[in-house]
């Protein structure tokens, strides 16, 4: 618990990561100013209002990354800021003006609001694995010193290229701004986020992670060599880094690496009713995982609590409780899942944040095409 109640702002508060982060902050006694695009839309914010301690510690604020000065009022008087929100539109015909500039300018606008407030002691940014390993030749292990290759991305313009560019440019611009203005800035880099959720829609990251259950083959290549973090671990890591005075720089937050075959092996006996495949094209026992090292985070004293099995089981059980997964699967129920997921707002990214991004719009929010470099599709969802 915080020794003295602080006031923090959470952007993108209605989304998969944002809403869980708000919940954990409220539990710890923080006053939380949650920014959303439309506080009056109860369909999008009721799950926040229903949280424990919300009546006494939570307030909703209207803000939009595309509007200059939009966050000034929400941030004024805050002790800290958690920037989770991000614009996205993988079908944009003008990605420079509709995706890249809003991402970078939105980031800088929030940072300017922090400087203007003169009360913000730390700014924690939810970055993306897409800022780390989008490059032509993949390494076995990635850490915080790695950055995606913008020249390679711009030359290939693979699926989702504007997202990789926007997140990378935004974080680099943030580091420059923070150094110039003396703002205490930390970025946390999650991989594919899996776990239970309190939002009313199916998080796209779970559409990807649970593709062996739904037998959605278009997603298999994304988790062929996957990296994962439990939603609760990720949100606790946000708060941990905010509270640790010695924290500095970038922090990868990824607890497990696994191939799709590994995932299948523990899902099959646990959920025999789903008939999870036992083999996948191009995948065998010799396929090695690609690691995103969280050593810097764990060396600070942070401990991951959840196993790979736990994060998947909790995801599945939440999806079943909310009606996003049937008790057992038939071809008809698979079709129903795809139809439900057509309703996800992939163009505006409403309520979507790092770890829950659809990779391209099809009936399930992702294409089956292979990108120009291994693992690129993975980073669109992390």
Curated annotation (Swiss-Prot):
Enzyme Commission number(s) of this protein: 1.1.1.219, 1.1.1.234
Record's catalysed reaction(s): a (2R,3S,4S)-leucoanthocyanidin + NADP(+) = a (2R,3R)-dihydroflavonol + NADPH + H(+); (2S)-flavan-4-ol + NADP(+) = (2S)-flavanone + NADPH + H(+)
Domain of life (superkingdom): Eukaryota
One GO molecular-function entry: dihydrokaempferol 4-reductase activity
Keywords: Flavonoid biosynthesis, NADP, Oxidoreductase
Pfam families: Epimerase (PF01370)
Pathway(s) of this molecule: Pigment biosynthesis; anthocyanin biosynthesis
InterPro entries noted in UniProt: Epimerase_deHydtase, NAD(P)-bd_dom_sf, NAD(P)_dehydrat-like
GO cellular component, one term: extrinsic component of endoplasmic reticulum membrane
Enzyme class: oxidoreductase
One Gene Ontology biological process: anthocyanin-containing compound biosynthetic process
Residues involved in NADP(+) binding: 44, 163
SUPFAM superfamilies the UniProt entry points to: NAD(P)-binding Rossmann-fold domains (SSF51735)
Gene3D superfamilies: NAD(P)-binding Rossmann-like Domain
UniProt family annotation: Belongs to the NAD(P)-dependent epimerase/dehydratase family. Dihydroflavonol-4-reductase subfamily.
Record function comment: Bifunctional enzyme involved in flavonoid metabolism.
Name of the protein: Dihydroflavonol 4-reductase
Gene name of the record: DFRA
């Amino acid at each position: 618990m915080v020794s003295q109640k602080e006031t923090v702002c959470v952007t993108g508060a209605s989304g998969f990561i944002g809403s869980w982060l708000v919940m954990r902050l409220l539990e710890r006694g923080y006053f939380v100013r949650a920014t959303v695009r439309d506080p009056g839309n109860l369909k999008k914010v009721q799950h926040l209002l229903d949280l424990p301690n919300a009546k006494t510690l939570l307030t909703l604020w209207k803000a939009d990354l595309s509007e200059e000065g939009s966050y000034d009022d929400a941030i004024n008087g805050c002790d800290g800021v958690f920037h989770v929100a991000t614009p996205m539109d993988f079908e944009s015909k003008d990605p420079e003006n509709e995706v890249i500039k809003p991402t970078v300018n939105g980031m800088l606008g929030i940072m300017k609001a922090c400087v203007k407030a003169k009360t913000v002691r730390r700014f924690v940014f939810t970055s993306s694995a897409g800022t780390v390993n989008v490059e032509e030749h993949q390494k076995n292990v990635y850490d915080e010193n790695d950055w995606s290759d913008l020249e390679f991305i711009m030359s290939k313009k693979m699926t989702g290229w504007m997202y990789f560019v926007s997140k990378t440019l935004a974080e680099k611009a943030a580091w420059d701004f923070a150094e110039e203005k003396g703002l205490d800035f930390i970025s946390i880099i999650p991989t594919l986020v899996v776990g239970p959720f309190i939002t009313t829609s199916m998080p796209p990251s779970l559409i990807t992670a649970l593709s062996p259950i739904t037998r959605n083959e278009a997603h298999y290549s994304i988790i062929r060599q996957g990296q994962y973090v439990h939603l609760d671990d990720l949100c606790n890591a946000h708060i941990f880094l905010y509270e640790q005075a010695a924290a500095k720089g970038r922090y990868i937050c990824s607890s497990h690496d696994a191939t799709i075959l590994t995932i299948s092996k523990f899902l099959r006996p646990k959920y025999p009713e789903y008939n999870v495949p036992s083999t996948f094209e191009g995948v065998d026992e010799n396929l090695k995982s690609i690691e995103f090292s969280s050593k810097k985070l764990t060396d600070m004293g942070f401990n991951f609590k959840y196993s790979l099995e736990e994060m998947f089981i909790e995801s599945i059980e939440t999806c079943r409780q909310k009606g996003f997964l049937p008790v057992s699967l038939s071809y008809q129920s698979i079709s129903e899942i795809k139809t439900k997921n057509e309703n996800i707002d992939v163009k505006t990214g409403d309520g979507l944040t790092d770890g829950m991004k659809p990779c391209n719009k099809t009936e399930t929010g992702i294409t089956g095409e292979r990108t120009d470099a291994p693992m690129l599709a993975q980073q669109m969802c992390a």
